[in-house]
């Protein structure tokens, strides 16, 4: 059956890991969509248990008969972006075991009248790694016909093996 995506929304902060998302789908076969959602929920609960035991996928029928939807080409570009974009931990610190050095997350995804916007929080304690990760996002976005705007840039805060401030803070903390 054919289906179209009319809108989607994730969390409201680009530097937070989303805990929910919604999507409006135009669907000709509601029972098939409900079966698919139930199957995905079962699989994802199995894969993410015990971290996400309450993971839920809900299908709620909407009686809206007319709405704007993404073209097939646009939907394919969005899907390609979501499947190919880096997400999560990209590198761990070589200086401090267990410390994330470079990471990013897709915090906000919205569909407007003429654009799909994805907002990422890109972080790294190494400036060059953060720049490289931002460049990866830029290249992928441009290859898919999109544009990139960088804002809210947090500077890298590199680990220093010799840090008088850290030594003082450790003394004060004790």
Residue ranges and their predicted role:
Residues 2-5, 48-53, 99-101, 144-147, ...:
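Short secondary-structure junctions
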Residues 19-26, 60-63, 116-123, 150-152:
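Short, hydrophobic beta-strand segments
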Residues 31, 58-104, 110-113, 127-132, ...:
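An extended, acidic, His-containing surface patch that forms the Zn2+-binding/catalytic region
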Residues 8-12, 18, 104-108, 113:
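Glycine/acidic-rich beta-strand-loop module
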Residues 17-19, 51, 98, 112-114:
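Solvent-exposed loop and beta-edge segments used for protein-protein assembly and interaction
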Residues 38-49, 139-146:
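A common structural junction motif
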Residues 3-12, 22, 26-32, 36, ...:
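Intrinsically disordered, low-complexity segments enriched in serine/proline and basic residues
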Residues 119-145:
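C-terminal, non-catalytic macromolecule-binding modules
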């Amino acid at each position: 059956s054919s289906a179209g995506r009319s809108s989607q929304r994730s969390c409201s902060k680009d530097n937070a890991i989303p805990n929910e998302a919604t999507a409006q789908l135009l669907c000709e076969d509601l029972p098939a969509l409900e079966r698919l959602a139930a199957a995905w929920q079962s699989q994802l609960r199995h894969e993410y248990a015990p971290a996400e035991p309450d993971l839920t996928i809900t299908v709620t029928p909407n009686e809206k008969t007319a709405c704007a939807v993404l073209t097939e080409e646009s939907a394919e570009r969005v899907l390609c972006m979501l499947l190919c974009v880096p997400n999560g931990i990209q590198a761990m610190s070589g200086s401090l075991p267990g410390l994330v050095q470079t990471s990013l997350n897709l915090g906000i995804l919205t569909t407007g009248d003429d654009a799909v916007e994805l907002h990422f929080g890109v972080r790294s304690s190494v400036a060059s790694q953060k720049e490289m990760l931002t460049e990866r996002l830029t290249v992928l976005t441009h290859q898919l016909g999109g544009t990139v705007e960088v804002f809210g840039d947090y500077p890298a805060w590199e680990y220093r093996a010799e840090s008088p401030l850290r030594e003082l803070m450790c003394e004060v903390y004790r």
